[in-house]
């Protein structure tokens, strides 16, 4: 699949942005497919990234029971299934929507 630098060069990697919608706006412009890879460029100890199960956990960025949580960076997530992948940490969040077959 294609490798996506999350946020693209314009956001400078996975870090807090002045606009909390920055990553959601970036994600809305992408056309993700299964086997695509999300590359989160951040430094270990400065950030983390989580994929959560439900939209409610996403909106609250509740990472107590994540699908996966990566405290060390940089990191990559492969989009293995169609559907909505809810990604968040702190005020950084977006949904990676992967169309079905």
Swiss-Prot record:
InterPro entries: Cupredoxin (IPR008972), Phytocyanin-like (IPR039391), Phytocyanin_dom (IPR003245). Glycans are attached at residues 41, 84. Residues 2-101 form the Phytocyanin domain. The modification Blocked carboxyl end (Arg) is found at residue 101. SUPFAM superfamilies: Cupredoxins. Keywords: Allergen, Disulfide bond, Glycoprotein. GO terms for cellular component: plasma membrane. The modification Cysteine derivative is found at residue 97. One of its GO terms (molecular function) is electron transfer activity. The identity of the saccharide is not reported. The sugar attached to Ser-84 is represented simply as Hex. Cys-97 sulfhydryl group is modified but does not form an interchain disulfide bond. Gene3D superfamilies: Cupredoxins - blue copper proteins. Disulfide bonds join 61-88. PANTHER family: BLUE COPPER PROTEIN, OS12G0150500 PROTEIN. This is Pollen allergen Amb a 3. It comes from Ambrosia artemisiifolia var. elatior.
